[in-house]
UniProtKB/Swiss-Prot annotation:
Keyword Coiled coil applies: no
Catalytic residues identified in the record: 25, 58
Coiled coil spans: none
Keywords: Autocatalytic cleavage, Cytoplasm, Decarboxylase, Lyase, Pantothenate biosynthesis, Pyruvate, Schiff base, Zymogen
Gene Ontology terms: biological process: alanine biosynthetic process; pantothenate biosynthetic process
Required cofactor names: pyruvate
Organism: Listeria innocua serovar 6a (strain ATCC BAA-680 / CLIP 11262)
Pfam families named in the record: Asp_decarbox
Domain of life assignment: Bacteria
Name of the protein in its database record: Aspartate 1-decarboxylase
Length: 127
């Protein structure tokens, strides 16, 4: 049996752009992607902390160090520039792999630079 587990998480990302006329996806600073082991074209879930919206799309890598978090196409309807979002990727693991899997989690500052790398996410973690 395979289990779907969180593989990477970008916490407290601030939306820098929303481009309705782009074909689709989310553009993410590639330095952030590397830190959480996310790849171009990988499916991600985005949760908007400001309005509660949850959407799925795929990744386009942005300029490293730019701090870009840009929702494109229809996804742009679910955010406004300045909204704080959580971006998560998932992987499928065997039951044995799932027991030892450790997702990569980063917390960003208000300019979308990595502020902290969390070794684990415990119950009732608040920042």
């Amino acid at each position: 049996m395979f289990r779907t587990m969180m593989n990477g998480k970008i916490h407290r990302a601030t939306v820098t752009e929303a481009n309705l006329n782009y074909v689709g996806s989310i553009t993410i600073d590639s330095a952030i992607l590397e830190a959480v082991d996310m790849l171009p074209n990988e499916k991600v879930q985005i949760v908007n902390n400001n309005n509660g919206a949850r959407i799925e799309t795929y990744i386009i890598p942005g300029e490293p160090g730019s701090g870009v978090i840009c929702l494109n196409g229809a996804a742009a309807r679910h955010v406004q520039v300045g909204d704080v979002v959580i971006i998560m990727s998932y992987g499928m693991f065997t039951s044995e792999e799932a027991k030892t899997h450790e997702p990569k989690i980063v917390v960003l500052d208000e300019k979308n630079h990595i502020e902290m790398i969390l070794p684990e996410e415990k119950a009732h973690t608040t920042l």
